[in-house]
């Protein structure tokens, strides 16, 4: 089959202007947190967890003095498995911000803890970070002498 050079030049010129195909842009996968929620719901379903009503808020106290505060919290529990799930959006706050809200909820047995907390806030130090606090806890531990039994030490 003979090739006509004029037609070939015309086709080549036309093909330069047209772009067939192109670079493929891969679709970005959208990872949703709903997958985690469905896994959690399935796990709680296997444990036969039931929704617990009447809990309006929850507070988790951290060692550094901060508090994870859940204003609106959903609670599900499976008492036979000793498993409870708290769901919601936490806010990290200082203990001092939450004291007015926590005071009415505490009973008389917690007044001593509140006094200690107030002293810590006024003093501006944390007893766990203080080396003297660790030494005070070790005073109750007896020293063992070589050759003595643990039960014999008083």
From Swiss-Prot:
Domain NAC-A/B per the UniProt entry, residue ranges: 34-99
Highest taxon, organism lineage: Eukaryota
InterPro entries reported in the protein's UniProt record: BTF3, NAC_A/B_dom_sf, Nas_poly-pep-assoc_cplx_dom
GO cellular component: cytoplasm; nucleus
Keywords from the named record: Cytoplasm, Nucleus, Protein transport, Repressor, Transcription, Transcription regulation, Transport
An example Gene Ontology biological process: protein transport
Region: Disordered, residue numbers: 125-154
Pfam families hit by this protein: NAC
Primary residence: cytoplasm
Database matches in PANTHER family: TRANSCRIPTION FACTOR BTF3 FAMILY MEMBER (PTHR10351)
Role summary: Component of the nascent polypeptide-associated complex (NAC), a dynamic component of the ribosomal exit tunnel, protecting the emerging polypeptides from interaction with other cytoplasmic proteins to ensure appropriate nascent protein targeting. The NAC complex also promotes mitochondrial protein import by enhancing productive ribosome interactions with the outer mitochondrial membrane and blocks the inappropriate interaction of ribosomes translating non-secretory nascent polypeptides with translocation sites in the membrane of the endoplasmic reticulum.
Entry similarity comment: Belongs to the NAC-beta family.
Protein name (record): Nascent polypeptide-associated complex subunit beta
């Amino acid at each position: 089959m003979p090739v006509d050079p004029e037609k070939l030049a015309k086709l080549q010129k036309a093909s330069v202007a047209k772009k067939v195909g192109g670079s493929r842009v891969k679709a970005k996968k959208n990872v949703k947190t709903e997958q985690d929620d469905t896994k959690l719901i399935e796990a709680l379903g296997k444990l036969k967890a039931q929704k617990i009503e009447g809990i309006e808020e929850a507070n988790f106290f951290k060692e550094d003095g901060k508090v994870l505060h859940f204003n609106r919290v959903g609670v599900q529990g499976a008492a036979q498995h000793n498993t409870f799930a708290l769901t919601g959006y936490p806010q990290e706050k200082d203990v001092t911000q939450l004291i007015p809200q926590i005071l009415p909820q505490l009973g008389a047995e917690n007044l001593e803890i509140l006094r200690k907390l107030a002293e810590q806030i006024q003093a501006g130090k944390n007893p766990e970070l203080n080396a003297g606090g660790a030494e005070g806890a070790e005073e109750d531990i007896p020293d063992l002498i070589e050759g003595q039994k643990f039960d014999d030490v008083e």
